[in-house]
């Protein structure tokens, strides 16, 4: 594999169809080289709350990643030498958290290995101790573990922050492809947001603003894939979300929605993503202007269907002066950003 779509043609009758769809998703054209999203906002709501009164509101200074494989626009192309030198497929970072004030400075970094047998190397920055520590794969697969670490606990601390979203659900799914078994459930025409009208996204008036809904919904042909977590020692007793159903766009290869099941096999949460296709993230952009139209995520909603609690991710955010947000394949995500020492410095 060098770059582009690993499997341009997927036959539904192919016994490996599900795995091919997932690798197409993994190397999807949304962000091939690097990306930085500035001032990403995450807000959580209970039924009855409003956009003006969230249970919790987070702002992350920078969310970024750098791919070593499959690069198409920014040198080195198509493979960064680090891929073979360090066996790293890509790096991801989300830091520093700017609010709430007691979480200021929190963040995490993860490196994904090319080797399917090697789990992610991850680090978290504790706002309480002002030190970085290694994070386990199970913490990044569990929203409660992440919040515990954010509270400064980490294996025993008291996590007090309200959110549905776990790092493995970023962009619909961010866990290691090799850690799951996949089953092809079929193709279905379903509604999805691929050409979002609003960027930043607008809150839904029908549920008090707990989700996103006034959008340009359209019928899309989606692949439906079941993902079941393998039993690995890295995940301990198993992830809190052992089963997921993905609805993957057959043209853009991103996850439009995902149903998430708990350890008892019951539907627990559902995720919906909102995506746009344009040459700039906002109409009046001055810097983030791309040479051609790109797909990018404007929002993600992660809702607990058992109690109506929802978490909404906005990129661009609505409360920040930085509305351009998405800097895709512009070379802004450098190796230094993904250094745990840089994360520690940003927290001080």
Region locations from a protein language model:
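Helix N-terminus capping/helix-initiation residues
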Residues: 17, 304, 333-334
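Gly/Pro-enriched, hydrophobic low-complexity segments
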Residues: 1-3, 94-103, 107-177, 207-326
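Generic structural motif
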Residues: 182-183, 264
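Solvent-exposed N-terminal domain segments of exported/luminal and surface proteins
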Residues: 1-119, 126
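Long, low-complexity, polar/charged, intrinsically disordered or flexibly structured peripheral segments
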Residues: 200-207
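Gram-negative outer-membrane assembly/targeting C-terminal domains
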Residues: 327-348
């Amino acid at each position: 594999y060098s770059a582009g779509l690993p499997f341009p043609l997927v036959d539904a009758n192919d016994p490996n169809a599900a795995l091919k769809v997932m690798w197409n998703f993994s190397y999807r054209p949304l962000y091939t080289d690097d990306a930085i999203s500035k001032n990403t906002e995450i807000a959580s709501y209970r039924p009855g709350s409003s956009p003006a009164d969230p249970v919790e509101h987070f702002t992350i200074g920078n969310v970024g990643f750098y791919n070593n494989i499959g690069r198409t626009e920014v040198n080195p192309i198509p493979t960064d030498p680090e891929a073979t030198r360090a066996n790293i497929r890509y790096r991801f970072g989300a830091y520093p958290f700017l609010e709430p004030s007691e979480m200021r400075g929190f963040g995490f970094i993860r490196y994904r290995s090319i080797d399917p047998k090697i789990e992610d190397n991850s680090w978290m920055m504790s706002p309480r101790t002002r030190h970085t520590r290694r994070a386990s794969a199970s913490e990044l697969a569990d929203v409660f573990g992440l919040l515990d670490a954010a509270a400064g606990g980490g294996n025993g601390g008291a996590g007090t922050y309200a959110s549905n979203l776990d790092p493995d659900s970023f962009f619909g799914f961010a866990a290691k492809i090799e850690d799951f078994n996949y089953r092809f459930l079929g193709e279905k025409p379903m509604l999805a947001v691929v050409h979002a009208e609003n960027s930043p996204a607008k809150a839904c008036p029908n549920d008090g603003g707990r989700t996103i809904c006034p959008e340009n919904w359209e019928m899309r042909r989606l692949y439906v894939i079941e993902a079941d977590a393998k039993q690995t020692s890295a995940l301990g007793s198993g992830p809190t979300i052992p089963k997921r159903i993905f609805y993957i766009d057959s043209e853009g290869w991103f996850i439009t929605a995902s149903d998430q099941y708990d350890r008892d096999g019951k539907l627990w949460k559902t995720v919906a993503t909102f995506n746009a296709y344009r040459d700039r993230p906002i109409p009046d952009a001055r810097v983030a202007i791309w040479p051609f139209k790109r797909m990018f995520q404007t929002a993600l909603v992660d809702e607990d269907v058992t109690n109506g609690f929802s978490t909404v991710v906005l990129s661009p955010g609505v409360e920040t002066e930085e509305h351009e947000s998405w800097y895709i394949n512009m070379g802004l995500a450098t190796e230094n950003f993904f250094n745990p020492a840089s994360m520690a410095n940003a927290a001080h």
